[in-house]
Amino acid sequence: MKSRSNVLSIVLAGGEGKRLYPFTADRAKPAVPFGGNYRLIDFVLSNLVNAGYYKICVLTQYKSHSLDRHISQSWQLSGLTGQYITPVPAQQRLGKRWFTGSADAILQSLNLVYDEQPDYIIVFGADHVYRMDPEQMVQEHIKAGAGVTVAGLRVPRHEATAFGVIQADDDNKIEQFLEKPAEPPSVPDDPEVSFASMGNYVFTAQTLIDALKEDSEDENSNHDMGGDIIPRLVDRGEAYVYDFSNNYVPGETERDKGYWRDVGTVDAFYEAHMDLISVHPVFNLYNQQWPIHTAETGNLPPAKFVKGGIAQSSMVSAGCIISAGTVRNSVLSENVVVEEGASVEGCVIMPGVRIGRGAVVRHAIIDKNVQVSAGEIIGVDRARDQDRFTISKGGVVCIGKNVVV
């Protein structure tokens, strides 16, 4: 696919991800494993690359080592042809300080924009699960003559109170941008639906540069893209909404069209995994016309089931061994071992976990390299689990990496 040389893509990957603790205790949220083989950042990078955008800067900050390593190992493009996906940590170009917000992160990285001199700049988040062809959004942005275009997700109006909400006119021009309003405005064609901001933006380059510089001089600003930059451009009449429901991705089905999940909490992260494992999944990882790319599994052998080991309604990644154990309604990352008599149900298991002989694990997320001892019981006795582990509001047992339980 031809590289779109007049567009620079910036992926915001510097957030701490506190609500996803303990899985962000030692890594940035975009580096959290997802769906067996992937990291969260693989979804946005796949969308950009599949659409032909090969100049991508990933702005990082907190606990970025595993994220930087993943990008370096999994996302190598040809520098000889001007293609790159590069992690960019805080450079402290404007003083000895870290990024103070998403807008400040881009402001401190404007040298990248000046080097490329793009006409348009894509600014996407790094921690959502979805498929999207961003080229369609770019074309709508150009057609509208917008300064910024904001991707809008149609959600039931009663659920929109949890989002930044867009009020737009019949021509998709944004009239208001409201943060978690008690009375969300509806979309023009449906009184029961609102536009929630997806945190994905397309800017005319000079518009973004000017807005960032103005924002940097505002002492009352939090220097946030959604909270400060977008409202500034809305007030000027330069902001438009892009209706995500109009986006078409090759190979999509009616069931997974328009799928988008913010997995910023443990319960949302868990439920997004459960979306993957039905016979006709709500989100289909097997769409090869718009693949989710990664090199995470390397040269691992196929999963192996021995001594009557079984897995039902589950995803089991390469290198796993199920030996006379049972796995149901679960997602297993690579190199997971389930020993004889062990039972795993309704779980998300990250790489390198060993479930010991006769252990029972229910309704849990277990991070990398955890060893569950023989005969251990997790997710059955909540009172006992609360004394040992983190438990989400939805009752998901959370076990951090590199421990023996």
From Swiss-Prot:
Q: Which residues bind alpha-D-glucose 1-phosphate?
A: G164, E179, K180, S197
Instruction: State whether it acts alone or in a complex, and with which partners, per the record.
Output: Homotetramer.
Q: What is the lineage of its organism?
A: Bacteria, Bacillati, Actinomycetota, Actinomycetes, Mycobacteriales
Species for this entry: Corynebacterium jeikeium (strain K411)
Recorded metabolic or biological pathway in which this protein acts:
Glycan biosynthesis; glycogen biosynthesis
PROSITE patterns recorded for this chain? ADP_GLC_PYROPHOSPH_2, ADP_GLC_PYROPHOSPH_3
Q: What is the name of the protein in this document?
A: Glucose-1-phosphate adenylyltransferase
Q: Which reaction does it catalyse?
A: alpha-D-glucose 1-phosphate + ATP + H(+) = ADP-alpha-D-glucose + diphosphate
An example GO BP is: glycogen biosynthetic process
What would be an example GO MF term here? Answer: glucose-1-phosphate adenylyltransferase activity
What are the alphabetically sorted keywords of the record?
A: ATP-binding, Carbohydrate metabolism, Glycogen biosynthesis, Glycogen metabolism, Nucleotide-binding, Nucleotidyltransferase, Transferase
Q: State the protein's purpose.
A: Involved in the biosynthesis of ADP-glucose, a building block required for the elongation reactions to produce glycogen. Catalyzes the reaction between ATP and alpha-D-glucose 1-phosphate (G1P) to produce pyrophosphate and ADP-Glc.
One protein family per Pfam: Hexapep_GlmU
* Homology family: Belongs to the bacterial/plant glucose-1-phosphate adenylyltransferase family.
- Enzyme class per UniProt: transferase
Q: Which InterPro entries match?
A: ADP-Glc_PPase, ADP_Glu_pyroP_CS, GlgC_bac, GlmU/GlgC-like_hexapep, NTP_transferase_dom, Nucleotide-diphossugar_trans, Trimer_LpxA-like_sf
Enzyme nomenclature, EC number? 2.7.7.27
Record has Transferase as a keyword? yes
